Amino acid sequence: MAPLASPSVIPKIPPWLLRRDSPLRFRPELDVDQWRWCLEFLAACNQRTADTTTERLLRLAFYSRSLMHELVESESIDFDYVQNGKLVVHTHPESFASAVRLMEYQRSLVAEQRALDPRQCVELEPALEHMAERMAGAIYTPSEDVGDTYKFCNELKRLMESGPDPVAFRFGVEVERLLPWRERLMGVETNVGVLEADHYVLALGTNAPYLLEPLGIRVPVYPLKGYSLTLPVTDDRGAPRISVTDFKRKVVYARIGDDLRVAGMADLSGKHAVIDAERVDQLVEEVARTFPRATDFSALKPWCGMRPATPRGTPVIGATKHANLWLDVGHGALGFTLALATGRIVADLAAGRVPAIPLDGFILH
């Protein structure tokens, strides 16, 4: 696990900006938030900051994984969850050498990983045979999990509605503004009236700044548009069992139930979640080149979403200047990876409990 902001990104930025099929695409807008985010991102592209961010993300991810294991063991939930490991594949020797150095650093933080050569990669994941000649090596993390996030959210909703203290969900209600009173919130104004509560948790992704800025609170969150394809697996041996990340192309492949989920791209191109057909075609080409026998492309389901990214890659969680307003935003592409940890931390803080892990680097200043 490593942040996007790192020294290795700097030399890649010029070619990324010039190529239409680059994994990171930038379309400048007359948007102060976009340019400020870009400057803060570039400032974070140094080794010291990258190492610190890596340590913090691993700390949070390990905690989230332990909470996930507790949940799966204690509750009967079905979301195609499986612990199948992950391979991060590198196609350039220099990139692989850098990944090995990062692996050694992450090992010092108790991350279980090992480096594999191309032959070992294909032995572990035979579906990678079509990529073998392009591979320099891969980093294997056996403890990685996958699951269907949509099913997971529905299962959590079911559990919360059926528990001893049932939760009421109010879908379709639009939050218009937060109502501060001195050092607290007195309510939330919505399209159906004012809602009042003891505590308020703001977990709105890229929409968080719109509600916080009138209160004088700035969170460095800006949308990075990402894409995914969901494809039926038509050849079991042709589709990967282990999750695979193509490091150069920034594309992730994961078997989820009977489907292959393919996700990638990062478009810094404004705040509109509109699917770009060209980006979908590029993802299709990546799948066809890497796992040509895996699926039937005529049945693909494309999707795009706005990742709430911070320049450093760390979420913003915890307290604000209003005593009963809490933040849980800025997870970027790691929402599912970090969600249980950040949710538990905010719940602990609101209840007056001490969180299980240190929060340096996550608190809003």
Residues covered by each model-derived region:
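Dinucleotide-binding Rossmann-like beta1-alpha1 core, especially the glycine-rich loop
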Residues: 1-118
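C-terminal lid/capping helical subdomain adjacent to the catalytic/cofactor pocket in oxidative enzymes
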Residues: 115, 128, 178-182, 233, ...
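Helical element adjacent to the flavin cofactor pocket in flavoenzyme catalytic cores
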Residues: 97-109, 129-199
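General small-molecule cofactor/ligand-binding pocket signal
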Residues: 114-116, 168-170, 300
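Surface-exposed helix-capping loop/turn segments at secondary-structure junctions
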Residues: 70-82, 162-168, 217, 291-298, ...
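Short, conserved active-site loop motifs that form the nucleotide-linked donor/cofactor pocket
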Residues: 166-168, 260, 325
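Active-site substrate-recognition segment that forms the wall
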Residues: 1-45, 129, 175-186, 194-323
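Short beta-strand to alpha-helix junction loop
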Residues: 52-65, 88-98, 138-158, 274-282, ...
